[in-house]
Regions:
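Alpha-helical scaffolding within the catalytic cores
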Residues: 85, 140-141, 249-262, 291-300
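Aromatic-lined carbohydrate-recognition surfaces of secreted/lumenal glycan-active proteins
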Residues: 199-257, 303-321
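Glycoside hydrolase catalytic-domain groove-lining segments
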Residues: 260, 266-322
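Hydrophobic faces of well-ordered beta-strands that scaffold small-molecule active sites
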Residues: 61, 97-101, 155-157, 228-230, ...
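Aromatic- and acid-rich polysaccharide-binding/catalytic face
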Residues: 96-108, 167, 174, 179-196, ...
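Substrate-binding cleft of extracellular glycoside hydrolase catalytic domains
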Residues: 102-225
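N-terminal module-boundary/linker segments of secreted carbohydrate-active enzymes
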Residues: 48-93, 120-128
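N-terminal signal peptide
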Residues: 27, 32-35, 39-60
């Protein structure tokens, strides 16, 4: 693990101590956050407003290496050895950075492992969900996972069951659109298909916004010193499909959709796009994927006042294999 991590060593920013906590919301800093999602390894790269030249950055360690102690491997000193900012005592969630996976009781369509069929949690779709119940459970999860009410680090809400833009629920998320149209058909049996789709879109997006906005607001109210945001936004969907049709830039349609959810970015303290890489992409295509997604995140950040920071999630294991990124990131 340390050999893999050495690929990403960098000179720490002169304005911060390696043992310091997460940055304030108003201080521009370059950072790399090393983190994990389930059993995978993550890195978070906080880009300074200038994308052309990054002179220094900090590394934040948020990997559950406390589990390695039983095997004789001890990681609690990586902050001293590699100038890494690390949660005290090498905890996964701690004073510097904490991530919440699917917290609360968001409406969702979940799969039963035994039958592979979907069942509804809290109504299945946001327009059928109980917001009060969700927020009550979210607050309970927040108290359990981040008990320190003075937590002043980075707080990430990782909710990926559906996206607040109705159209973007495609592929494996198509059931959310199907259920939304079905609900409208039951409410309006004589409406045309186009009318049903428009009403499904309107209600899904209005209530989806309410769930995401109120969750973020509650997190900020209960842990006001932390810097909060949602993982993976803004979406871009670049470098997908056949090689001949892949594009570095987010499509104009996606950019317009991201403009429609400025409420999400205005309500966040930090913007957390994802630039996970696929091994099947060529090195130049991987560069294009990163550039396009970071460019879109910075574009969105430039529309916020005050301008939000951008922390980019980069997993240093490919998403389509178990191979580590090596040469392509040197």
């Amino acid at each position: 693990l340390l050999q893999s991590f050495q690929q990403f060593r960098a000179k720490p920013a002169s304005s911060s101590s390696p043992s310091s906590s997460a940055p304030s919301k108003s201080t521009p800093t370059n950072m790399v956050y090393v983190s994990t999602r389930s059993t995978t390894l993550w890195m978070l790269l906080l880009l300074l407003q200038n994308l052309v030249t990054i002179k220094s950055f900090e590394v934040y360690w948020n990997i559950p290496t406390f589990m390695c102690n039983q095997f004789g491997f001890e990681f609690s000193s990586v902050n001293r050895t590699y100038s890494v900012v690390q949660n005290r005592n090498d905890t996964f969630r701690g004073n510097a950075v904490s991530i919440l996976y699917d917290p609360g009781k968001f409406p969702a369509l979940l799969e039963k492992p035994s039958t592979k069929t979907l069942y509804k949690r809290n109504g299945g779709v946001p327009q059928e969900g109980n917001l009060t119940e969700h927020l009550e459970i979210f607050e309970r999860h927040l108290d359990e996972l981040i008990p320190d009410r003075n937590f002043s680090g980075i707080g990430i809400i990782d909710f990926e069951s559906w996206r607040p833009i109705y159209r973007q629920n495609f592929g494996s998320l198509q059931p959310y659109k199907d259920l939304s149209v079905k609900i409208e058909r039951e409410r309006h049996p004589y409406w045309s298909g186009n009318h049903l789709e428009r009403e499904a879109t309107r209600r899904f997006e209005a209530t989806g916004r309410e769930f995401m906005e109120q969750t973020l607001l509650l997190a900020k109210q209960r842990r006001p010193q932390a810097a909060w945001g949602y993982y993976a936004f803004p979406y871009c969907f670049n470098m997908n499909g056949a090689a001949s049709t892949r594009s570095e830039n987010c499509s104009p349609e996606v950019q317009r959709e991201n403009n429609r959810i400025m409420w999400l970015f205005d309500g966040s303290d930090i913007i957390f796009p994802s630039v996970y890489l696929r091994e099947k992409l060529s090195p130049s295509e991987r560069e294009q994927l990163i550039r396009g997604r970071v460019r879109e995140a910075v574009r969105v950040a430039q529309r916020t006042k005050p301008r939000r920071k951008v922390l980019t999630y980069l997993r240093y294991v490919y998403t389509d294999s178990i191979q580590y990124l090596t040469e392509c990131l040197r």
